[in-house]
Amino acid sequence: MTTDKKSKSKSSEKSTQEVEQVIKPEKTPILDTSKWPLLLKNYDQLSVRTGHYTPIPNGHSPLKRPIKEYVKYGIINLDKPSNPSSHEVVAWIRTILRVTKTGHSGTLDPKVTGCLIVCIERATRLVKSQQGAGKEYIGIVRLHGAIEGTTELSKAVDTLTGALFQRPPQKSAVKKRLRVRTIHNSKLLEFDPERNLGLIWVDCEAGTYIRTLCVHIGLLMGVGGHMQELRRVRSGIMSEKKGQVTMHDVKDAQYEYDNSKDESYLRRVIQPLEAILTNYKRIVVKDSAINAICYGAKLMIPGLLRYEQDIESNEEVVLITTKGEAIAIGIAQMTTASMATCDHGVVATIKRVIMDRDVYPVRWGLGPKAKVKKEMIKDGKLDKFGKPNEKTPSDWTNTYTYYTGQVATTTTTSPVESMNVDTPKKATASVAVKAEVESSEDEKPVPKKEKKDKKEKKKDSSDDESEEEKSSKKDKKEKKEKKEKKEKKSSKDDSDDESSKKEKKDKKRKKSSDKDSDSEKESSDKKDKKDKKEKKKSKN
């Protein structure tokens, strides 16, 4: 019997071993975040500050926004047509999409075609960042004479790289002053010796004039030259290879949405604004801190979730939500090492807010200190900005620290003391809160008798000071009175002089009027005499 039991137990063990070998546990699936869209790409490679936060059911993923918000937070990678100006094209898109605000990422001349990033509504806040981004062009140079071979031309094109002096051409509506522009790279792609046409590719800084570059190439070749045609291939991060649309596409997409309510074409034409920001380093923010940032607050350490590696201080970064929405463009105040180690401090200041206010709920002012502060503001113990005033208790000023800087407390005095104390003494009485905090930590509670003695000493000292101040005040008053007397005298003298001048003028006027009247009388007498003589002659 015992042998049978042992054999059964051995067989059961073997069976369990076989089962363990046959049914293996499933491996945990690995998230492939490399395929996640836009700003969430490679999300798992970001450094983690904390994984604990409360997700709020607000906001939308950039690609899943409602169509009105999608258009409001959208950009268009437009292939600009040849004859209209950039401003005309942008105005046409504004009327087609029926939006209030549009902008573009750097003007193109009317005859130039190619990449023009059109920003819609809230995306216009990113126009400045895109105008300063690098550009790529492909242009045709026409030389004014024949040249021997293409090697010299390719050398001339290669030499025109780096920092160059450029003056805007006569056609441009810009002030014609000398500028410095850097050309990162340039190549000669083709050359047609029969027609003296060369095809060049240029990677340059924003604001470079390819027209003047073509003139310089002609000067280097010794035959002269000018630009025949130009096309922008890349503007910032957007190129003609991906997602470029024409004006007809925009018009058709809006027509489809208006008539058949089909959003798919409009979503294909318009891209989310996050597509422009993929080259920025990212900082992921907690949902509770988003609305404060939209109101202009700095990002502090408690609001930080994840951050990119190799962030340096004073570097431009993009602040994003856990859903991948862009909140703002900020300037990093910490490196990645300090973000990982610091317990408090400012992570980034805000350069440009992108997201609308109140998309996420207000989550500030909910802590215990904030509630006490609100009650004190209601009771009048703090002013409307939450800063101390006359009624603030000393416990509050001694314990509460103001992170916005030094805050001066206004102190009041009794009417008797205010008679004795001068204004500069009042100014010295207002002390910064930090200084009060330090002094209060060192001081111990003082008994009442000592307080009375101190008050009496202060009164005595104030009496001594008041006597000196009174004497100084008297001197000042006397000086003022003397000055006033002098001013009155001078004003009287001036008035006397003016009155005398007026009298003289009146006398002159009277004399002149008397003379005029005498002369009139004489002339009338002469006339009468003449008339009498003529009458006598006529009688005779």
Swiss-Prot record:
GO MF annotation: an example: RNA binding
Domain annotation PUA: ranges: 280-355
GO cellular component, one term: box H/ACA snoRNP complex
Pfam entry (one): TruB_C_2
Biased composition (Basic and acidic residues): 490-503, 513-528
Enzyme Commission number(s): 5.4.99.-
Keyword field: Coiled coil, Isomerase, Nucleus, Ribonucleoprotein, Ribosome biogenesis, RNA-binding, rRNA processing
Region described as Disordered: spans on this chain: 1-24, 414-540
First-level EC class: isomerase
Domain of life: Eukaryota
Subcellular location(s) of the protein: Nucleus, Nucleolus
SUPFAM superfamilies with a match to the protein in the record: Pseudouridine synthase, PUA domain-like
Active site per database record: D109 (nucleophile)
Coiled coil, from the record: 448-494
Compositional bias segments (type: Basic residues): 473-489, 529-540
InterPro entries cross-referenced by the UniProt entry: Dyskerin-like (IPR012960), PsdUridine_synth_cat_dom_sf (IPR020103), PsdUridine_synth_N (IPR002501), PUA (IPR002478), PUA-like_sf (IPR015947), PUA_sf (IPR036974), tRNA_PsdUridine_synth_B_fam (IPR004802), TruB_C (IPR032819)
GO biological process terms held by the UniProt record: box H/ACA sno(s)RNA 3'-end processing; DNA damage response; mRNA pseudouridine synthesis; response to mercury ion; response to oxidative stress; rRNA pseudouridine synthesis; snRNA pseudouridine synthesis
Catalytic activity: a uridine in RNA = a pseudouridine in RNA
Physiological role: Plays a central role in ribosomal RNA processing. Probable catalytic subunit of H/ACA small nucleolar ribonucleoprotein (H/ACA snoRNP) complex, which catalyzes pseudouridylation of rRNA. This involves the isomerization of uridine such that the ribose is subsequently attached to C5, instead of the normal N1. Pseudouridine ('psi') residues may serve to stabilize the conformation of rRNAs.
Listed NCBIfam families: CBF5, PRK04270.1, unchar_dom_2
Protein family (similarity comment): Belongs to the pseudouridine synthase TruB family.
Subunit-structure text: Component of the small nucleolar ribonucleoprotein particles containing H/ACA-type snoRNAs (H/ACA snoRNPs).
Name used for this protein in its record: Probable H/ACA ribonucleoprotein complex subunit 4
Native source organism of the sequence: Dictyostelium discoideum
Taxonomic path: Eukaryota, Amoebozoa, Evosea, Eumycetozoa, Dictyostelia
Gene designation: nola4
